[in-house]
Amino acid sequence: CGMIEPDKGQVFLNEQDVTQWPMYRRAREGGMGYLPQQTSVFAKLSTEQNLLAMMELLGMNRRQRKLRCEELLEQFRITHIRRSKAGKLSGGEKRRLEIARCLVSNPEIIMLDEPFAGIDPVTVQSIQGIIGDLRDRGISILITDHAAREILQITDRTYVISEGQVLCSGTAEEIVRHDEVREKYLGDIDSFDQSAAPAPHFSLTQQGGTTSAGSGLRRRRTDLDLS
């Protein structure tokens, strides 16, 4: 996402070398969104102000900010907490706000770091639904997480990384059949039925056409890195 300079290799997005681009440039020009594991809301601002602040940074005018803010509040079902201080929200409410704020710039790719950390099981299902809806809109999603059981339900392809090396990659079923992955990460999971994944709690409105992403990520793919 641009926070750490790679030791080697290059990062391409839509055939553009973005290896040396800082995070803000990747977001504004490259269409890349990033959600860190740590809570990133502006605690002293309201839910609504958190969204508006990002829109101002992007240079949106007042009318654009109002329309986009109302749209995101409704899409993520956080209208009822629009004036609540972000620091007082529950873990799940903060996570929905963070994802909504990440979408302000209409990214083509979203990178999620441990999106299920610190939230209750019901909210986990809600976030799974949100991720599924984003994928269906044509947004590529790259997830780094240790919550294998939750993540394997929603990823199209998974990469398991151990000691800096790719241990294996494939579909959920291919991952759970890998002996070394089972031993190190999955324990007694015998199979994995993605059809059992929770249905989305709500749908996100499609804005314009679907987008495509480069750097090896297919359109509408959700990837997982179990490091």
Task: Enumerate the language-model features and the residues they cover.
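Short coil-to-helix segment of the ABC ATPase nucleotide-binding domain corresponding to the Q-loop/switch region
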Residues: 45-52
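Conserved catalytic motifs of ABC-family nucleotide-binding domains
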Residues: 106
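Conserved ABC ATPase signature
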Residues: 85-89, 93
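Helix-to-loop junction immediately C-terminal to a conserved catalytic motif
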Residues: 1
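Catalytic Walker B motif of ABC-type/P-loop ATPase nucleotide-binding domains
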Residues: 110-114
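Conserved ABC ATPase "signature" region
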Residues: 16, 52, 63-81, 128-132
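ABC ATPase NBD coupling module
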Residues: 5, 17-33, 38, 62-66, ...
